[in-house]
Amino acid sequence: KMLSGNEAVARGAWEAGVAVASAYPGTPSTEILENFGRYPNVYAEWAPNEKVALDTAIGAAYAGKRALATMKHVGLNVAADSLMYAAYTGAEAGLVIASADDPAMHSSQNEQDNRVFAKLARIPCLEPSDSQQAKDLTVAAFDLSERFDTPVLLRLTTRICHSQSAVELGERAEPGDGTPKPFVRNIPKYVMVPGNAIKRHPVIEQRILDIAKLAETFPYNVIEPGDPALGIITAGVAYQYAKEVFPTASVLRLGMTWPLPAGLIRQFAASVERLIVIEELDPFIEEAVRLLGLKVEGKAIFPLLGELDPRVVRESAIRAGLLPAEARVPLPEVDPGALPPRPPVLCPGCPHRSSFYVLNKLKVPVNGDIGCYTLGLLHPLNAIHTTGCMGASIGVAHGAVKAGSPERHVAVIGDSTFFHSGIPALVNVVYNHSPVITIIMDNRVTGMTGHQGNPVNGQTLQGGQNQEIELEPLVRAIGIKHVRTVEAFDVKAVEKALKEYLALDEPAVLITREACALLPEARKRWVPLEVIADKCNGCTLCFRIGCPAILKSDELDERMQRPKALIDAGLCTGCEVCAQICPRDAITFRPEAE
């Protein structure tokens, strides 16, 4: 069956008998849990953040059930504390962390190589190079976890996650007899006070040495003999590129990239004249091979930055003399002007647009966060001035205030991100009395990753409906005295609240609430607007909200000599933000909608 890498990991987890899986959605890993949750006899959940997801998986594994935690690469930063203690404790049942790196930062704020976490934690790292291996190595990861009493890191990358290839399916294997096991009270193993942890450290050091011995015969570490003039060590999707560009070369394909099989690498190196490593991002394998005392080339030839592809590998090889210039594959001629530019933009009817319009109007420093609303930085809204990572907005605003910044700082954060890591930062604002204004943009869903449920709507991954957690009572319980919830599309209400908060010298929270325009309940309300051409004078004010549905018409206003506005009825959702800011009442609902 044709499966994406994410679908294959989900299938592998199900075949391996995984009972519990937890994740926070993040591209390119999101679809793993979405697909796993559709299988029978499993429990799958969206957690508020990746640390909670990993702790959940650890708890399930302590209780004797195989467990999986999935996340994108930066999610493992959030979960790192839990990863490190789990490396010390091990578990009663298999525990696997699937972490998806994002070379070229297609949807991420950085480009880190998470194989280093395996080395840091002294745990094995497996790295599939196609969908079949994604499934098979997931199964192998759970077997490895239980054999050596260790968490296992499954390192994926964007192209493995989202590319499809043929996968041979197997059946589910239920570990044991399937009956629930009582919790095992093993204090020296599971209670990481210093006296116990100091005894566990030698255990994990010996464990990684034992796994290194296994790596020599690990069935997914394979030498593919070829022309001895060139030997290539590679892993992950880079294997596919290596085989395409160097079809006759000798190849060592690594399915376990930590610990590395030192003996197998030496054997392979001795059989070739020139040894190179082709890998995405850091020179992780290359440096380990060099530490073995072997002559090897890697990042001196192939890029350190961005993702690889056959063209990049081929061009790099030509420059290094590994291939003749005749090997260059000419690219088809493309007219750069053949396609119009398509910059990212907030959707028509996005409930965040009005807030950014007001923030731009008020000219205040705005600290952004991770989500659809990051697009508020773009012209013509121009209303985001910092963005770092999940939950950073409130803390960064607080720091700027405490550094003596004379302006009032605003933090904008989405509902899902607030639950992810914004709550501790808001507690800090109250505790250390910082007059930060926080806008929680509540669009009732985790939007950017594909409309996953979260605590604000109570929708579970497997289709259930649990209790909704209300933002306003939560914020008041933290100690914020000035809290207000307004309709996100009500421009006057947003502006009035922000002006009142700017006059205060205390922390304040504004919750702007409206369902994401792409949710079914919002789509039912879509009724397009139109511009009354006779009233429009081309003032361009409506263009400043950056709505894709508002266009420049061919008709010029005689006095202003500017194009009048035109609304695309096929895009307009009828949010009325443009109508509210039009000074001439030139925007109204279409007659057929009334």
What is each residue range found by the language model?
Residues 1-6, 16, 128-346, 351-355, ...:
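Flexible, low-complexity linker and terminal segments
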Residues 1-131, 159, 225-226, 291-511, 521-522:
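Thiamine diphosphate
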Residues 32-35, 58, 79-83, 105-112, ...:
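Short acidic, glycine/serine/threonine-rich loops at helix termini
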Residues 35-41, 242-252, 473-479:
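Short helix-loop-beta junction
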Residues 41-48, 89-100, 179, 185, ...:
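A glycine-rich helix N-cap at a beta->alpha junction
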Residues 102-151, 157, 189, 195, ...:
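Conserved thiamine diphosphate
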